[in-house]
Regions:
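Bacterial Sec-dependent N-terminal signal peptides
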Residues: 1-22
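Residue-level detector of conserved, function-critical positions
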Residues: 20-207
């Protein structure tokens, strides 16, 4: 009887020492800024270093990091926090818009960009849609609108800190591909960005 009590006690201690925190997770990735991405079904969440799910599973977390191998395991992308920001994606009328949440899961920059990068040294690159009135149709009695995309550097509050002077004609409603438009700019230093112009030459800007 005494041996049975000791055995039951040891089993309880063993169970306590190896308590299960999270179960039925499909994918788990390394920590970035004290948070690790976990996937369950088609949704992603984040755990802290104690294994607790601190950002609940959600479907809007994006899966790419355009300019860095960080966040890539093999051929798979996963969401990751950089500078306390993580990309999210929202689809409106079959067009994807990108924004950011913070490490508490709060939406800091609402999805409004046609493409966006992860933050790096406090800044990110984004592609924003713009429309300009370039004339007036006398027959239809309506403005003639030119749809463009423009690239900017933004800070972690979503403020535009540098216009990259490379507008491109673009109409998302007429685009067959669901892939986001491609960047023609890239960070090359802490506050340096290179921009490829239409003649395929590069200009370098400080911001």
């Amino acid at each position: 009887m005494k041996n049975l009590v000791v055995l039951l006690f040891l089993l309880q201690v063993h169970s306590f020492c190896f308590a299960q925190i999270l179960s039925d997770v499909d994918e788990v990735y390394p920590f970035s800024e004290d948070l690790a991405a976990v996937k369950k079904g088609n949704e992603w969440g984040f755990i802290n270093k104690k294994g607790a799910l601190v950002i609940s599973y959600r479907s809007d977390l994006d899966l790419k990091d355009n300019f860095s191998e960080k966040g890539k395991i093999g051929n798979k992308w996963h969401p990751a926090f950089k500078d306390d920001r993580c990309l999210i994606k929202k689809t409106i009328n079959e067009v994807n818009y990108y924004g950011y949440i913070d490490s508490k899961g709060n939406e800091i920059i609402h999805p409004q960009y046609l493409n966006a990068t992860n933050f790096e040294n406090g800044f990110a690159l984004i592609i924003a849609p713009s429309k300009d009135v370039i004339g007036f149709n006398e027959i239809l009695k309506k403005d003639i609108i030119s749809s463009n995309i423009e690239e900017f550097v933004i800070n972690t509050l979503g403020e535009k800190v540098r216009y990259l002077e490379n507008p491109i004609n673009y109409d998302s409603s007429k685009r067959k591909s669901k892939l986001p438009p491609v960047f023609h700019s890239k960070f090359i230093g802490a506050r340096l960005v290179a921009v490829q112009k239409k003649d395929m030459k590069w200009d370098i800007y400080e911001f």
